Amino acid sequence: MANGRTHTKIAGTADYDDPAFWDTKFATGQDVGEWLNPGENIVQAALSDLENRSFGPERSPRVLHLGPGISKLGTKLREAFVDRDWKGSGIVNVDFSSEAIRLGQEIESEQDPSHAMHWLRADLRAWNDMSSLAPFAPFDIILDKSTSDAIATSPSAPFSPTSISHDTCPVLRDIVDTQGEITVSPVELLALHLVPLTTEGTMWIALSYSTMRFDNLPRLAKYWDIVSRTSLKAPQGQVSSFAHTPEVFHWLYTLRRK
């Protein structure tokens, strides 16, 4: 993966899709760490699903945390794993910021190896990077706290039979083989990249500011069902105190792998 932007920036958007942007924010302490809210709802949704499955000493849950940055969400989940005698090492944090990975690995180096989370650098839009997660797959849960929102600021990607290579996701390769030249939105591309890393029943739990983050994406819908979409009132610090300001809501999505 390149260290900086590899495509044209969409006018009017922040550099959310540029790893160098995040490296600077994390290294200089400019990022607050928790986007939208601290993520307790995501943790509870993940635990509720996992507790309805069968796990034991030989098979702890496997969780893929997308774009954690410096969030404490993974740490909260790991603590819940330890309380349930699940191995925290089943949690894999993946981010395209080298600084986020460095900070995460530094913290985990102090943990017991069986409970130390993995931190891996990868661009979620690049299958050459995502395929490196295969040794940890299949994942039972995907955690996504506004990462899809950030990815959505990227431009759509064109694919054609002549552009397909061994670095192309096999799911995407099959689509191009059938349909020919296509253009894939960034969130749809992420959804397709997650397919080979998951199995039927895998849950993708995503917190977003958008009321329609996963809507009208037919290629996503082929592999993922939107099971629920729950409104969550935004924390007070993110809304104006002016009396007539409307309430602001975030959205907790649950998608199930078909």
Roles of regions detected by a PLM:
Residues 215-258:
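Class I S-adenosyl-L-methionine
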